[in-house]
């Protein structure tokens, strides 16, 4: 703009239509190495993890269900949430223990014990 007032000659309008979007190739042309040694290492690591999990987790009983238990920390009183897989009868035993003399502490209180 030249001068104190705008004129039509000062305003440049680009009235051409916007260009249409162009297709983009999203394919990845990366070549993976065919190393059976890498696969053996992955399989060996996977098998070790499966064996560890098999020892860490007992078999879930066929009549077992998942239950959420909310209790308070014995030391600080913060609410604790437990999830157990158990049969209905075993859950009743756990309930009796929690209502009786069995107390649970939170991880922060457990580290101070």
UniProtKB/Swiss-Prot annotation:
Keywords, comma-separated and alphabetical: Activator, DNA-binding, Early protein, G1/S host cell cycle checkpoint dysregulation by virus, Host cytoplasm, Host nucleus, Host-virus interaction, Inhibition of host innate immune response by virus, Inhibition of host interferon signaling pathway by virus, Interferon antiviral system evasion, Metal-binding, Modulation of host cell cycle by virus, Oncogene, Transcription, Transcription regulation, Viral immunoevasion, Zinc, Zinc-finger
SUPFAM superfamilies: E7 C-terminal domain-like (SSF161234)
Motif (LXCXE motif) on chain: 26-30
GO molecular function: DNA binding; DNA-binding transcription factor activity; protein domain specific binding; zinc ion binding
Superkingdom assignment: Viruses
GO cellular component, one term: host cell nucleus
Zn-finger region bounds: unnamed: 73-109
Main location: host cell
Span list, region Disordered: 30-62
One annotated GO biological process: symbiont-mediated suppression of host innate immune response
InterPro entries for this protein: Papilloma_E7 (IPR000148)
Placement of sequence motif Nuclear export signal: 91-99
TM stretches of this protein: none
Post-translational modification summary for this protein: Highly phosphorylated.
Domain notes: The E7 terminal domain is an intrinsically disordered domain, whose flexibility and conformational transitions confer target adaptability to the oncoprotein. It allows adaptation to a variety of protein targets and exposes the PEST degradation sequence that regulates its turnover in the cell.
Stated family: Belongs to the papillomaviridae E7 protein family.
Record HAMAP family: PPV_E7 (MF_04004)
Function: Plays a role in viral genome replication by driving entry of quiescent cells into the cell cycle. Stimulation of progression from G1 to S phase allows the virus to efficiently use the cellular DNA replicating machinery to achieve viral genome replication. E7 protein has both transforming and trans-activating activities. Induces the disassembly of the E2F1 transcription factor from RB1, with subsequent transcriptional activation of E2F1-regulated S-phase genes. Interferes with host histone deacetylation mediated by HDAC1 and HDAC2, leading to transcription activation.
Subunit structure: Homodimer. Homooligomer. Interacts with host RB1; this interaction induces dissociation of RB1-E2F1 complex thereby disrupting RB1 activity. Interacts with host EP300; this interaction represses EP300 transcriptional activity. Interacts with protein E2; this interaction inhibits E7 oncogenic activity. Interacts with host TMEM173/STING; this interaction impairs the ability of TMEM173/STING to sense cytosolic DNA and promote the production of type I interferon (IFN-alpha and IFN-beta).
The name this protein goes by in its record: Protein E7
Source species taxonomy: Viruses, Monodnaviria, Shotokuvirae, Cossaviricota, Papovaviricetes
Gene: E7
């Amino acid at each position: 703009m030249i001068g104190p007032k705008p004129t039509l000659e000062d305003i440049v309008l680009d009235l051409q239509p916007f260009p249409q979007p162009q297709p983009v190739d999203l394919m990845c042309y990366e070549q993976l190495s065919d190393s059976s040694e890498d696969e053996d290492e992955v399989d060996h690591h996977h098998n070790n993890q499966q064996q560890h999990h098999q020892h860490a987790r007992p078999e879930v009983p066929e009549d077992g269900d998942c239950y959420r238990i909310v209790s308070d920390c014995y030391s600080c009183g913060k609410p604790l949430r437990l999830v157990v897989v158990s049969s209905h009868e075993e859950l009743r035993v756990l309930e009796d223990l929690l209502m009786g003399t069995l107390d649970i502490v939170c991880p922060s209180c457990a580290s101070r014990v």
